[in-house]
Amino acid sequence: GGTEAVKYGFSGGYYFEDGMIQLQEYTRYNLRSVIDITINKHVSFGGSMYAVHSIREKGNWDLLRDVFRMRPTQHPNSLVTGEEIWKYSGNNLFNPLVTSQNQRSQVKSLNLQSNIYLKITPIENLELTSSFSPYFTQTSMGDYIGVWTKAQQGTAKGAKANATKDNSLSWIWDNIVNYTWKKSVHS
């Protein structure tokens, strides 16, 4: 939208995808904005921004492998007591229904990319442009591994959790001088 002197735009989005197995999903939010302002024939400036926030739940990364290794005759619960079985004694496989509820992995990320510029035309055919483009990213990763998982083997070691966070900032600053001339060829 806008006028001859000011042009602007804004958009946003949302995306959600359910995973094939329990506790897997992906969610993303994004925003975009842009503005261009012309003060007069000598000065203009503007900027743009694009931001994305995403959350990815990875669930239990051993789940499908455990399901494919199980015999079709193995029951998730004891046929005698009705209790959940977390590890089968005959083949040392783990019950994927129990391990899937005791292990989680999540990744959150925020990405922000923007640009601001100033364009000056002091004389005809000469343009001086300066633009600054920062890029910021933040990633947080976390894992929870409960007692009833392959890693912990149901021992008294207790559950484990870990979290990491990574931030990164980079930028590009361009200064451009552009002079345009026309050369005509006459016959």
Stretches with model-predicted labels:
Residues 7:
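Glycine-rich phosphate/pyrophosphate-binding loops
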Residues 19-113, 129-187:
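Surface-exposed loop/interface segments of Gram-negative outer-membrane beta-barrel transport/assembly proteins
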Residues 1-4, 14, 37, 49, ...:
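Residue-level signature of outer-membrane beta-barrel architecture
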